[in-house]
């Protein structure tokens, strides 16, 4: 699986809601997103619908997806970010937005006008957003609805890039369902904490071709630790417990 980007560790003061890319910022992390923008264009030049997923929660895919969206936007591209995680609404939480109308209401037929779903400048003035909406009882079934395909087709007419911030691939089926509309899958791995027991599963996803043009972005890269032999694949920080928010108590 190709590794197309490496995002350095953030400052302690910068949370998952941080936007670290701007025209005036030239530090290592901002430059890493610019390089990611270039490298993604190199490996899949025609890709316009980019899906972000991960192994489990806590990898930083929402942070990476929103900052890549900004990196693309400041290069002159029209970009929209969709929160396709109908279970946890991560992008909504990060932006401090509590909209009842969103992707879930559109897919369920409660809303038929895409224009009313789009929020302008929620976390950056040059990036539009469609938030998840109310939490539905049947997220996977909603995402299988052909209305989702129709929405993506409509957005393709308006935007150069459509960024989908999705659920972790090994937690629920939603990511595999959404992948049918994507051109490129960006699999985010947080450096130093991936449990090695997941590596065969990751390779299986790649070999089975469930995710189109699957590639890896290494997030929170610990440069100093790597000098001493640590880093990617070394830790066991997750165990099998990072599924909070994706299953109900009954499940």
List each language-model region with its residue ranges.
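P-loop NTP-binding module
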Residues: 8-11, 18-19, 23-251
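Membrane-cytosol interface motif
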Residues: 1-9
């Amino acid at each position: 699986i190709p590794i197309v980007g490496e995002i350095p560790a953030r400052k302690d003061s910068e949370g998952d809601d941080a936007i670290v890319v701007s025209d005036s910022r030239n530090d290592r992390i901002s430059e890493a997103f610019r390089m990611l923008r270039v490298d993604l264009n190199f490996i899949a030049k025609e890709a316009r619908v980019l899906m972000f997923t991960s192994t489990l929660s806590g990898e930083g895919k929402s942070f990476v997806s929103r900052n890549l969206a900004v990196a693309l936007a400041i290069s002159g591209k029209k970009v929209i970010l969709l929160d396709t995680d109908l279970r946890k609404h991560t992008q909504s939480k990060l932006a401090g937005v509590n909209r009842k109308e969103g992707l879930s209401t559109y897919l369920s037929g409660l809303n038929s006008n895409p224009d009313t779903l789009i929020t302008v400048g929620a976390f950056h003035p040059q990036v539009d957003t469609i938030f998840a909406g109310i939490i539905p009882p049947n997220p996977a079934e909603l995402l299988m609805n052909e209305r989702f395909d129709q929405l993506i087709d409509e957005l393709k007419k308006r935007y150069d890039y459509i960024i989908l911030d999705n659920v972790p691939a090994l937690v629920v089926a939603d990511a595999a369902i959404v992948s049918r509309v994507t051109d490129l899958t960006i699999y985010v791995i947080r450096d130093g904490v991936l449990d090695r027991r997941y590596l065969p599963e990751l390779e299986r996803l790649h070999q089975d071709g469930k995710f189109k043009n699957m590639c890896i972005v290494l997030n929170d890269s610990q440069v100093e630790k790597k000098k001493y032999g640590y880093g990617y694949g070394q830790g066991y920080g997750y165990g099998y417990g990072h599924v909070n928010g994706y299953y109900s108590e009954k499940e």
